[in-house]
Design a protein with these regions (language model features):
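Bacterial N-terminal signal peptides that target proteins for export
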Residues: 1-8
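Short secondary-structure boundary motifs at beta->alpha junctions and helix caps
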Residues: 161-197
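C-terminal motif of bacterial Sec signal peptides marking the signal peptidase cleavage site
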Residues: 15-18
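Stable alpha-helical elements in mature extracytoplasmic
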Residues: 40, 72, 76, 80, ...
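N-terminal segment of the mature soluble domain
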Residues: 55-105
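Bacterial lipoprotein signal-peptidase II cleavage site
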Residues: 20-26
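Post-signal peptide N-terminal segment of mature Sec-exported envelope proteins
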Residues: 28-46
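Surface-exposed short loop/turn segments
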Residues: 104-159
């Protein structure tokens, strides 16, 4: 169920980035890792439409929601949209019309989260999936350690609320670390890593 693609064997640097501003893309890791996971019980062919939140949530130490929305973030969002379209899904403007919703998050400070079984996750982080007070739920086991400069993508099944506290189900996620830089070459590397996340998720198709 889990897949980990190590793109570089060099150790990742941990850098400090302010969560009050857009990420400083000149100060992030130069080596990257691509990790994906999914709910083995989900039939991804049953989904038809998707919606992507157009800003990237910045997860840091702030108690207020902050979002990354500039040219670089839009290129990252667009890359996920293209991959989902290539997988056969149709984009829709309104989240209420979508079978699945993708939200992207950027880790602005090193964050550690560990779990060994299914359960709610991130349901109290400010601004995270702020949709009608619903929480979010992973039906599969996982253990993560998130580094500064990571991007997390999560697909939510909007039609499958779980019986636990009205949580909606995360059916797929990707974790890509050390991608970003201010020049075109590093953005190309970022696009390659996003492509790799979908390449190692062959089940994610219409």
């Amino acid at each position: 169920m889990k897949k980990l693609q190590i793109i570089s064997l060099t150790a990742l640097m941990v850098l400090s980035v302010s969560c009050q501003k857009d990420p400083d893309t000149n100060r992030l890791d130069n080596d990257y890792i691509v990790y994906t996971n999914y709910d083995i019980g989900t039939d991804f062919k049953s989904f038809g439409t998707f919606h992507v939140i157009d800003s990237i949530l910045i997860i840091g130490n702030s108690d207020k929601a902050a979002y990354w929305n500039n040219d670089n973030s839009r290129k990252i969002v667009d890359a996920y949209v293209i991959e989902l379209e290539n997988a056969g899904y149709t984009p829709v403007e309104e989240s209420e019309e979508a079978d699945i919703i993708l939200q992207l998050s950027y880790i602005s400070n090193t964050y550690y989260f560990t779990s060994f079984g299914p359960g709610p996750w991130w349901n109290s982080y400010p601004g995270y999936w702020n949709w009608g007070g619903w929480g979010w739920y992973y039906p599969y086991s996982f253990t993560y350690s998130y580094s500064t400069g990571s991007i997390i993508g999560e697909l939510i099944d909007t039609n499958a609320p779980t019986p636990q506290n009205d949580k909606l189900t995360v059916v797929w996620n990707s974790y890509i670390c050390g991608l970003l830089d201010g020049n075109n070459l590093s953005l190309s590397r970022t696009m390659a890593a996003i492509n790799q996340a979908f390449k190692q998720s062959p089940y994610l198709t219409k």
